[in-house]
Regions:
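Charge-rich alpha-helical segments
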Residues: 1-109
Length: 109
């Protein structure tokens, strides 16, 4: 099994089919605590305070820029919900799972 957090996102401009439900389920096994909700990969990260939450969000923004793949974020005082989907393909792609693994690696720092 590949360490997704060490993989790099591939440019995606559409013309590629999204993962099937089975493909997404198979990829989900490589991630801890993530779920597929309404066709999006989602996870809620808890933090001790607002400072830690915002430090995570800012670091994630840098990773997202570097990978050119950006999540939808919902930020609260001590939590951040991260959702990934690939708009260009209208569903989930490998890039979503790569970035989810990078989120987990960041959270574990």
């Amino acid at each position: 099994m590949t360490d997704l957090s060490k993989s790099k996102c591939k440019p995606c401009e559409g013309g590629v089919a999204p993962y099937s439900a089975q493909q997404a389920k198979d990829m989900l096994r490589q991630l801890k605590g993530w779920s597929i909700e309404d066709g999006k990969l989602a996870k809620l990260y808890p933090f001790a305070n607002y400072y830690q939450t915002m430090a995570f969000v800012n670091a994630l923004a840098w990773i997202s820029h570097r990978e050119d793949h950006h999540p939808d974020l919902t930020v609260g005082y001590n939590k951040c919900r991260v959702e990934y989907s690939t708009h260009a393909v209208g569903g989930l792609s490998e890039n979503d799972f790569i970035c989810a693994a990078k989120c987990d690696a960041l959270f574990e720092l």
